[in-house]
Amino acid sequence: VEYACRDDFGGNLDEVSAWAGLHYFASRTGEAANAERDTVLTWPQGNGKLVELLAEGLADLRVNAMAFGVEVTNGTPRVKAIDAHGEAFEIEARAVLLCLPRFVARRLLDPAKASPDLVYSPWVVTNLTLDELPPSPGVLPAWDNVVFGSDTLGYVNATHQSLASVPQATVITHYETLCGQPPAKLREWMLTQTHAQWCSRAIDALAAPHPNLREHVTQADVWLWGHGMIRPTPGFIWGKTREAMQSATPPVFHAHSDMSGMALFEEAFTRGERVAAELRAWLG
């Protein structure tokens, strides 16, 4: 359970809402009518496939631009943005939907209307390119591999489904969520560590199943997610802060798993459906 709380909520048992843990694990007993319980639904593009499907229904889509401000004047929202060439522009709309975590959204909005600070868990993701995945004692490597007794979250093997009969180059992705101290303090500490230190940290964490892993590493890429996922801290799920986040504030609307307090795809999907209904009702 400790591992699952770090993996799904970004915190230790004492840092996570008991209700969130019970709700999440109680909801994982469903079984498909046409598949085994351990069947995984994936696409070669990953979640990019879902983005492509969602984009198909949009008639006027402008990409490669970044919004940096949202202002509402006399009831009319305007989005300030900048394109890939550095040119600034504005979009005037009847309504604006921000599908963003609140720590980002609050930087686009009037500070007086922004959400209060929420608790976000820092994550570190390390991609190790290997000339081959070295053998390990015990069971054969799976797609998602957890190291017993480790504080990290294990690794994912990119070529797990390969049908190759001989060892081949691969990429394994090592995940670690930092917890046990205030997130702000952990973010400060993250920035003091060098690339070499992060690489060694990941390799050392996988030394138990792969003692000679370091000999097979040809490249290492590290990414620090300072606000990797919202953490459902004790009291947050049924507290006034999250309750206030549910209220629509036309003409600016929000849709994100932050509003549920759990960084899960199912929660994000639900928030998208709900805000679509709110938008339709408000726009008439």
Ranges and model annotations:
Residues 1-69:
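Active-site/ligand-binding neighborhood in enzyme catalytic cores
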Residues 3, 49, 53-56, 107, ...:
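Residue-level signal for well-ordered alpha-helical scaffold segments within enzymatic catalytic domains
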Residues 8-12, 68, 73-75, 222-230:
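Short, internal active-site loops enriched in acidic
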Residues 39-47, 89-91, 117-119, 191-199, ...:
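Aromatic-acidic/polar surface patches that form glycan- and anion
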Residues 57, 92, 213-216:
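Short loop/turn motifs at secondary-structure junctions
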Residues 63-172, 176, 209:
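Mid-domain catalytic core of redox enzymes
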Residues 135-284:
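Conserved flavin/dinucleotide-binding core of flavoenzymes
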